[in-house]
């Protein structure tokens, strides 16, 4: 699971022909075997589910990180909103990881004043912070805000509320990662012939809400 600044660490491994598989994220300019989620498609579908529930003024909360999975989720949101004719509502709040909690609190308070109806969160950690901020500000879910996010969090079970979340195929990820890595170790796959696996995901509707 490479970070945005890990290219300089990965290249020496490839030069030494050490078996390597990227999981969850890719690095621009480095072609190595990978098992990834189709973040654009899944984010598009997640946003579409909110639209089908009747929401129109939908914004997104994301991280200000240059990571391929985060960029893909942002692209999927924007693409879906454009296709639905909701370009005028497209707005991505990019927050710093170490300041996300305080920043999101302000985002939620301001969003209510502007009439925002729903949010897509790029990660479940952001969603938990967003939900906490919503309740601290005296708002409710889904009456005041609709929520859609990537991945489940145990905190969702604590909040008696309705939301949409992406359930990633973790078992499929594990099987493909092991299959590719074992193949590299055995020499079944020619070095440099990178195999790229892209998986879909399930969208879960927790509760019967709007």
Enumerate the predicted regions with their spans.
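Short beta->alpha junction loops
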Residues: 91-100
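Flexible loop/hinge segments that line or gate small-molecule binding clefts
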Residues: 2-45, 125, 151-163
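Flexible loop/turn connectors
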Residues: 108-210
């Amino acid at each position: 699971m490479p970070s945005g600044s890990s290219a300089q660490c990965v290249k020496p491994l490839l030069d030494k022909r050490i078996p390597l598989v990227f999981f969850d994220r890719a690095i621009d300019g480095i072609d190595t075997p990978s098992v990834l989620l189709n973040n654009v498609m899944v984010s598009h579908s997640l946003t579409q589910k909110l639209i089908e529930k009747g929401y129109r003024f939908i914004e997104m909360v994301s991280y200000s990180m240059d990571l391929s999975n985060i960029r893909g989720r942002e692209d999927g949101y924007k693409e879906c909103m454009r296709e639905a004719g909701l370009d005028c509502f497209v707005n991505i709040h990019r927050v710093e990881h170490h300041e996300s909690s305080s920043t999101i609190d302000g985002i939620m308070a301001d969003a209510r004043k502007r009439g925002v109806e729903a949010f897509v969160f790029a990660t479940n950690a952001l969603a938990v912070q967003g939900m906490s901020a919503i309740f601290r500000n005296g708002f409710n879910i889904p009456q005041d805000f609709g929520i859609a996010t990537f991945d489940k969090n145990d905190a969702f079970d604590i909040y008696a509320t309705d939301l949409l979340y992406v359930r990633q195929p973790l078992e499929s990820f594990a099987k493909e990662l092991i299959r590719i890595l074992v193949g590299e170790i055995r020499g079944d796959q020619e070095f440099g012939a990178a195999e790229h696996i892209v998986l879909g995901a399930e969208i879960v509707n927790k509760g019967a809400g709007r």
